[in-house]
Amino acid sequence: MTLKDKVALVTGGSRGIGRSVCVRLAGAGAFVFINYARNEEAARETLRLVGQAGGNGKVVRFDVADDRATAEAIAALIREKGRIDILVNNAGESRDGLLVRMKEQDWGRVLDTNLTGAFHCCRAAAYAMMKQRGGRIINVSSLVALSGNAGQANYSASKAGLIGLTKSLARELAPRAICVNAVAPGLIDTDMTSAMTEEQREKILEGIPLSRLGTPDDVAGVVLFLASDEAGYITGQVIGVNGGLYM
């Protein structure tokens, strides 16, 4: 699969799944804008890995929850490169807690970043893609969007909303040859899971038919495919990457 001469924006590209997506897209030939909101050092490390993979990219800072900042940043990168071909909405955060103890700001911030942030990016990029008569939007949802999870009402709702956004935009943008899909990772071995005890890890592995945690690169491989010309007849789909944990 080649993405030669394509321009991509990956939100939340400073670590985890986002970092792997940046490296895979750049390695396939795309110029990758690596978005981050807070950790510039981590974003610079992603850029270093992009270069190590033989790719090219640039670090861009903006908070996807900020509509104006997002619109201005995406307009600037489109002016710089003349186009945007691939948008990967990966930026996200979690503020877990039981419903009766969840604060309003914890609910709101997760929805603002995970769902409204993706809306901001889609809206800012869609017009350019429509003018180009082509593009790829890939939203990073989650297994819990489909299964739910105790203590994650805000996170689950935000990721379920992403699936609704994906399907609606797939219908709306299809006449301009823009494919919109989602990936729904299961339990992925990132810094978010590194705090688990060995006992917790073993218990979880018992429920995964493939008997291992996923890796960021497992998810990035699917994103790469969906961003490619080979996926030109796929839109409105949710691809699970969960080792069989949820079928």
Residue ranges and their predicted role:
Residues 2, 119, 134, 178, ...:
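C-terminal substrate-recognition "lid" of short-chain dehydrogenase/reductases
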Residues 7, 14-15:
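Conserved glycine-rich cofactor-binding loop
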Residues 40, 61-72, 104, 217-218:
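The beta1-alpha1 cofactor-binding region of Rossmann-like NAD(H)/NADP(H)-dependent oxidoreductases
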Residues 98-99, 103-111, 193, 204:
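Substrate-binding pocket helix/loop in short-chain dehydrogenase/reductase
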Residues 122, 158, 166:
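Active-site helix of classical SDR
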Residues 127, 171-175, 232:
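Alpha-helical segment proximal to the catalytic Tyr-Lys
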Residues 142:
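Residue(s) in the substrate-gating loop at a strand-loop-helix junction
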